[in-house]
Amino acid sequence: MVQLTNKLFIVSLLAIIACGGGGGSSPTETDPGDGNETNPYDFPNATSLDQLNQIEIVTWNIRQFPQHSTTKSYVKSLLEVWNADIYLFQEISSESELISMVNSMTDYSYVVDDESGNLGFALVYKNSTVTFNSKNELWSDTPNSNDGDSDYENNAQYQFASRPPMENYITWTDGTKSMDLYVIDVHYKCCGDDSYDSSDPSDETNRRHHASLLLTDYVINNRSSDNVIIVGDFNNVGVQSVTNPTISPFTDPNIASSTHFLMVDEDILTGASSGYSWQGWTSSYSPAHFDHLIINQPLFQYGSTTTTGVIALPTETNTAATTVANRISDHQPVFMRFYP
């Protein structure tokens, strides 16, 4: 299924891989996918994202990685089959386990954050196409506690739930052309609702909205001529629309800053809930599209060549959704790729 909207081709991987899936048995709670006895983590339904001369970027909240003894095996196999240039992760609980996994992947290298504790960030990138230049953990030098006033700039880290955004300066090349990118990995405060209450500095939605104000201001004033992609788990609970206060500084046309940004997965946000990145498989809450990729103005010119989608993990692994949630993640990855 292909939809052409907002100058972006939005592709559902679910439709693609459903045509190419094997004749395996129904997903079960105990078997690790449609693998075989030799390698139970060989997933024939998993689809390569790698395309010649394109940049592929995947964002994924990988839920307290590794949450299960099999998590690393699942994730390593999937990352290698997807074969994307750039992966941005949230919720890395064990840096050593992440490092161990990537060290066993000969084609990839990693960068981890220093400031986010046991729910950290990681960049994993393909050695043949990506050069890591530097990182900057934004607002890591600001207080991370509620000071009780309405000035969100003087305790910016608190607005980001003590997880300072990890800005990665990288260079992509295919050997004939190259592009510098600033990719900012975020993980906003969870919970609450979708009501902005400016009188309560501890309110979850208040903090998420302020986090977006900080980011839009930073990019507009410091990276206006650079290629910037903001990715991650925005935790935009409540109504799934461009006016949700969590994301509105990027997406609401009534807010001036939104003219500088484009959420490339907006059609997923405003589409059917069955296509959202978070399905609530083991939760009483309704599905929501929490995971986004947002570009700034210099990248608008590539809109017509940009493809985005949610990677449907139960289909990719031929594994029951509850098993996916408990052994891999309760979030599904979201990807974008484009011709630079």
Each predicted region: which residue ranges?
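Active-site-proximal beta-strand elements of phosphoester/diester hydrolases
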Residues: 54-64, 136-137, 180-193, 197
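Acidic/histidine-rich helix-loop elements
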Residues: 59-71, 150-153, 192-207
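Bacterial N-terminal signal peptides that target proteins for export
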Residues: 1-9
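Structural recognition of the beta-strand scaffold that forms the well-ordered cores
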Residues: 56-59, 85-91, 111-113, 120-125, ...
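Structured beta-strand-rich core segments of catalytic domains in phosphoester-bond hydrolases
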Residues: 92-94, 98-189
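N-terminal, active-site-proximal structural segment of metallo-dependent hydrolase catalytic domains
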Residues: 20-109, 115-121, 156, 212-213, ...
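C-terminal motif of bacterial Sec signal peptides marking the signal peptidase cleavage site
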Residues: 16-18
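Metal-dependent phosphoester-hydrolase catalytic domains
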Residues: 37-39, 160, 220-229, 236-340
